[in-house]
A protein has these predicted regions:
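Catalytic domains that recognize anionic headgroups
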Residues: 1-181
């Protein structure tokens, strides 16, 4: 089951059940036409329950394509109540912001991703008595925040700075999964 909160899967998920969550309407998880990443956890049990039984019996792989820390609109990726690094850059025109504002806005997205991952792990923990569960988190790219006058990401790998190439990898295993040989 592919859940997408970014710009769609661009055909990658065409052969599997998929849901685009970024355009949903939810009073606390969406604002101004965009949804925050925890929307992917909303109604997740029902989405899995709607899969064919034969497919569920084999096990379910969930792919959650986050909006995460994608710029330049870092300020839109985090609900106001979760913003702890201020002042933050509140425009898409990154050159109009100080380095401190830009880093604060980006750091808010990282902290909110931590919150989202904690929620995802909590969801998995609730199911670990009946299922062996695992979470693997990996980012698709790093991000430049003005170092050497570079912003965002997307340079060819051969010339991209390390901050665009080095990404986090986080793994969480349920007790049952960890005990497997």
């Amino acid at each position: 089951l592919w859940l997408d909160n970014q710009a769609g899967c661009k055909g990658t998920c065409a052969r599997v059940p998929n849901v685009e969550t970024g355009n949903l309407k939810h009073p606390t998880l969406c604002s101004a036409g965009e949804c925050w990443d925890p929307i992917m956890l909303d109604s997740l049990d029902a989405r899995i329950g709607a899969l064919p039984a034969a497919q569920r019996d084999k096990g379910v792989l969930l792919v959650m394509h986050q909006m995460g820390s994608h710029g330049p609109a870092y300020h839109k990726r985090v609900p106001q109540a979760f913003k702890r690094f201020m002042p933050e850059c509140s425009t898409n025109n990154l050159q109009d912001c100080s380095r401190e504002q830009l880093v604060n806005a980006y750091d808010n997205t990282i902290a909110y991703t931590d919150h989202f991952l904690a929620q995802a792990i909590g969801w998995l923990q609730q199911r670990q008595t009946s299922h062996d569960t695992v979470m693997v988190y990996v980012s698709d790219h790093g991000e430049s925040l003005g170092e050497n006058n570079l912003y965002l990401h997307g340079l060819p790998y051969a010339i991209a700075p390390d901050v665009q190439k080095h990404v986090p990898w986080i793994t969480w295993l349920s007790h049952g999964f960890a005990q497997r040989q």
